[in-house]
């Protein structure tokens, strides 16, 4: 476990849990120094170009089926301001209604769909602009439109409302912390790794982000975001243009090459080696399909009725009137988010007209 990362989440006796971990797990091992440092990739002297291929069927066309991607490395994930600032820029440039970079590429007829991507879960985050269903011949125009549009934004300034909307959007997601069906503790743990993996002293910089959001709000209209675009997108040589081109029959060709490789390997084995390989394969299959022993299943902890609290959450209703309209106020912890539901009396609507009420949404 010398190279492991352990974290606890929830309301608990932390000292007791850490003591248990030490006595039942960590103390049973000797410490070993593991050189697991993730090295910084040196910047390129000039942006590079990569071409890769994906398979399409013989009935599909290669026309308008290429993916174009403009990619730049943006600092490191240990910079909490950059970590969120480019989330905001991704929204403002490529996702918001009327996003200028997406609109410029769409108006130029490059690709059938434009999207942005910001991978900030790695040591050196990557900001990408992607055109789906484009042509290889559009590569130069793709790069030119992106850089001309970004230069214009740097010279004339970002749309303040788009930046504010991007900040609000990301702050709302942060405060609400709605991870769908995934456990909140698990998702926090994964986000902690965005920084903890690269610096043992900075595990919480991305989950304690309210100060960073306040900083980003204060930078709107100051030239801060325009400078980020200039520094990390326009003048940054650490980037790549990636083309993913369609190729008919690629899957069949690769399957054939694999079969030939496996056949050559098989022929290189002795009869005894082949027999041993079959026996190992059969043993693995038998192990995987064997039912678990009852004593092993009983080791899995389960909840009993006594473990489940019988107390229910209190209902907090405070009735008020605002402008002679009845209001029911619930004072509960929402992490700074206000939720408002407005209800209308529909008793005056004829039953036959009720299906049409949804049109008003």
Predicted region positions:
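N- or domain-start disorder-to-order transition segments that initiate the globular core
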Residues: 296-338
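Charge-rich, well-structured scaffold segments of protease-associated domains
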Residues: 1-43, 63-69, 74-79, 91, ...
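Short, low-order "capping/linker" segments at domain edges
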Residues: 47-57, 174-178
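Short alpha-helical segments and helix-capping/turn motifs at coil-helix boundaries
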Residues: 50-55, 211, 222-231, 324-327, ...
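Active/ligand-binding-proximal structured segments within catalytic/core domains
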Residues: 81-93, 337-361
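Extended assembly/interaction regions that build large supramolecular complexes
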Residues: 45-46, 312
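Short beta-strand/turn micro-motifs at beta-sheet edges
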Residues: 56-59, 114-119, 328-330
